[in-house]
Amino acid sequence: MTTSTRGAHRTPAVLVLEDGRIFRGRAYGAVGATFGEAVFSTGMTGYQETLTDPSYHRQVVVMTAPHVGNTGINDEDMESRRIWVSGYVVRDPARVPSNWRSTRSLDQELAAQGVVGISGIDTRALTRHLRERGAMRVGIFSGNALPDEGTMLAEVRQTPEMSGADLSAEVATTEAYVVPAIGEKKFTVAAVDLGIKGMTPHRMAERGIEVHVLPATATVDDVYAVEPDGVFFSNGPGDPATADHPVSVMQGVLERGTPLFGICFGNQILGRALGFGTFKLKYGHRGINQPVQDRTTGKVEVTAHNHGFAVDAPLDQVSDTPYGRAEVSHVCLNDNVVEGLQLLDRPAFSVQYHPEAAAGPHDAAYLFDRFVNLMEGQRA
């Protein structure tokens, strides 16, 4: 529920966690009430890309950077058609942006899209609380006549948890569309949209790939109707344990031996397709400064992450799967979480992080080239 935003920055707001911890501040964006899973992002920049990343659907994002909104909002850096976060939490927002590309303030954009936020709270204390207690349900309430604390806490505890949530179909396209190759067309890729970011097909298009973006409900027949040279499974929100349909489609692709690449949720789908389990991380990886090691080369990359679940695969051995041998290709150096998988007997691999770098470092851009190399090898 959201209401008017006029004078919102003077309106009281309360953030209520499901364990009873309460933070008081001022409204930011729309005024009203919102609910979701409280998570924190450590990125110092890229807030516009974060807000419009469909993987954040049904999450209330806490920004650890103290100043947010300095460069306003523009029409070029959107990663999807709308803001997907359920709520937004900042310490010290910039009310007057300063950037030559800015067309409006972040506050105005949040208000226009009905996103309830809160400002002026101790985001460092909140982040530490989430790090120690784990991601949890949360509510943001703002207005001049707020309910009592007991009522607000009861409302938070009635909201659904992220575990068991099947959300891809809520954010994915409902109609297939094509992103044309930039320059000479070299390959055709079928991209299954589980919550795809706009920069991902663009990175492929830069490499001469015509990308056919398909709904999350696409079947194996739909995938092969576009006569793809490769198949891609995107990022997306929710619990991978619920994603039985994408897993089935990926297994059909693996059976045919078509080159396959997955990112983020796509990595978890590959893990499940190979017979591995998935699990929920305590507080997840979200930000643009996460160190990951490529175990093939030993190289360490600084990467962009947004995931609250991970694949449960052995780090110290090659695993036998229905599609041949598989191994963990990348690990996070902070906590040894699986950050990539690759098949040794078929042209298929995936990573848990975001090589499209929107926002974030470009250390992992080579993964798109690796996908191209797999498709070239299949033609040879």
Curated annotation (Swiss-Prot):
Residues 1-184 are annotated as: CPSase. SUPFAM superfamilies: Carbamoyl phosphate synthetase, small subunit N-terminal domain, Class I glutamine amidotransferase-like. Pathway: Amino-acid biosynthesis; L-arginine biosynthesis; carbamoyl phosphate from bicarbonate: step 1/1; Pyrimidine metabolism; UMP biosynthesis via de novo pathway; (S)-dihydroorotate from bicarbonate: step 1/3. InterPro entries: Anth_synth/Amidotransfase, CarbamoylP_synth_ssu, CarbamoylP_synth_ssu_N, CarbP_synth_ssu_N_sf, Class_I_gatase-like, CPSase_GATase1, GATASE. Its EC number is 6.3.5.5. It holds the Pfam family CPSase_sm_chain. Residues 188-380 form the Glutamine amidotransferase type-1 domain. GO terms for biological process: 'de novo' pyrimidine nucleobase biosynthetic process; 'de novo' UMP biosynthetic process; glutamine metabolic process; L-arginine biosynthetic process. Composed of two chains; the small (or glutamine) chain promotes the hydrolysis of glutamine to ammonia, which is used by the large (or ammonia) chain to synthesize carbamoyl phosphate. Tetramer of heterodimers (alpha,beta)4. This is Carbamoyl phosphate synthase small chain.
